Regions:
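N-terminal secretory/targeting leader peptides
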Residues: 8-237
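A gly/proline- and charged-residue-enriched helix-loop-helix capping module
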Residues: 1-8
Length: 237
């Protein structure tokens, strides 16, 4: 309902939108330096990101440059930036991230989740018979499920390729940096909530997360424990 309110009432768009293809957390990104473990290590670091993440990482002391994707590699080559994030192992490798940096830090709260949206012209959709509307809705759900599974397969395969074929070292972002990101969000969120609609969105998200993630954390067994059991020594975190 909040999404409908945003697109139709606030933005005045003649559309019906549906979310789909929930994507995992974006990596913290690519760094020339292999030793990025503390908040002090990123102070003043020239770093490419965009959107709300730019505000977040500026709050943490990084020198943020909001560059389009096509300018990332040239900017790294010229020393305009020292590090960058883009999206995921597949998208990153497609544009040659591995050619300008060899240290890839996974795990970050700068964009912990995202999803695609399917937009239909509202007049067109509502003019269709109920069965045809249902076909489109189920097609979105099917595409969402398929893309989620395909992405997990491709991202993991491309990450492995980056390590074995391109000499990339994969790191897990340190708890110190992750905790600092959360503190920075706690500073930024009250400013975002000054907008009444955004405040209702945040309240809805918090209510959902409090309930669903509680269940997930209580019910899901420790994946790292199982991974270490069956693949001892594979993780280097």
């Amino acid at each position: 309902e909040l999404y409908r309110e945003l697109t139709q009432d606030i933005m005045g768009l003649n559309v019906v939108g549906m979310f789909g293809f929930p994507m995992p957390s974006q990596p913290f990104g690519w760094f020339k330096d292999a030793d990025v473990t503390s908040v002090q290590d990123i102070q003043g670091l020239k770093y490419r990101t965009v959107g709300l993440a730019a505000d977040l990482l500026q709050e943490m002391g990084m020198a943020v440059a909001q560059l389009p994707g096509g300018e990332i590699v040239p900017a790294m080559e010229r020393g305009v930036i020292d590090a960058f994030e883009f999206n995921n192992p597949s998208s990153d490798s497609d544009f040659g991230a591995q050619d300008v940096a060899k240290n890839y830090y996974l795990g970050s709260y700068h964009q912990a989740s995202e999803s695609f949206e399917w937009l239909f012209n509202r007049d067109m959709l509502e003019s269709l018979d109920d069965d045809l509307q249902a076909i489109l809705i189920h097609a979105v759900e099917a595409a969402s499920t398929s893309n989620t599974a395909s992405a997990l397969d491709r991202y993991s395969a491309d990450l492995q390729s980056l390590q074995t074929e391109s000499g990339v070292t994969v790191h897990r972002t340190s708890d110190e940096i992750l905790a600092a990101q959360l503190e920075a969000w706690s500073t930024l969120i009250p400013t975002l909530e000054e907008d009444s609609f955004m405040r209702r969105v945040m309240e809805s998200q918090k209510e959902w997360v409090e309930r669903t993630v509680f269940y997930e954390l209580m019910n899901q067994p420790d994946l790292q424990l199982a991974y270490d059991h069956f693949f001892p020594g594979r993780l280097n975190m």
